[in-house]
């Protein structure tokens, strides 16, 4: 059960000028170039910063009951009343004061953490496995290009 607990943002994987993946810590990521945003458009830059802040605020909660949750911070400026209404309406779920995505099953296989993304599909006509190994070679929980470290 060494995986059970809360994992917080460590770094974001981005491509450098040589098309190699490099990992940026929160401060570096927040201040890195925005190649897909018109940086002269203040509203677009503000939207991108809002998304980046949300990313660096994310957590992974691995529970002892075999469920794993991706947690996102509540949006800035949202009142408790608005949060309560959204929860009551079933629009969002809360866990540890954060918005929780759908639970994903996890299990240990040969001493390694695996979780079910729920993403099904095919690769070259073969059904792909929706289960992925969670911990990379450096010991980080990796979801897409985001690395998390256990606290």
Question: Model features per residue range: what roles?
Answer:
Residues 1-36:
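Tryptophan-anchored aromatic micro-motifs
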Residues 12-17, 39-150:
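Contiguous, well-ordered beta-strand patches that form the walls/edges
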